[in-house]
A protein has these predicted regions:
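Carbohydrate-interacting regions of secretory-pathway proteins
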Residues: 1-112
Length: 112
């Protein structure tokens, strides 16, 4: 799930790279990000390959890992030449910020 300042960062101009998106693949249904300086409440639910992105109590998007739809989207993306992209349904969780300071708090990971 993309974490981004939708008011200032150049990636905001493309919906698929705006806050809440499945980065560069699926755009959020609506912009629900709070202004800079306020914390957003994020929930990512992953159960049996079904993924949901929630931002500030609004479901932004959902998809099924391994579905023909997601495979088609990936096949047309910059990730198509990465053979392991979206192949594992277990592993480590990473937080990445390559566009300035990013702050997180109250991170909880629960098994469903």
């Amino acid at each position: 799930m993309q974490v981004l300042d939708n008011t200032a960062h150049p990636d905001r101009q493309k919906k698929e790279t705006s806050a809440g998106a499945l980065y560069d693949l699926i755009a959020p249904k609506k912009e629900m990000v709070k202004p800079v300086g306020q914390y957003n409440k994020v929930r990512i639910i992953s159960k049996s390959g079904h993924i949901e992105h929630w931002l500030n109590c609004f479901k932004l998007l959902e998809y099924d890992f391994g579905s023909s739809e997601i495979k088609s989207i990936i096949s047309k993306s910059k990730f198509r030449d990465m053979p392991l992209f979206a192949k594992n349904n277990f592993g480590r969780i990473g937080f990445q910020g390559d566009h300035g300071e990013v702050w997180y708090r109250n991170i909880r990971i629960r098994e469903l």
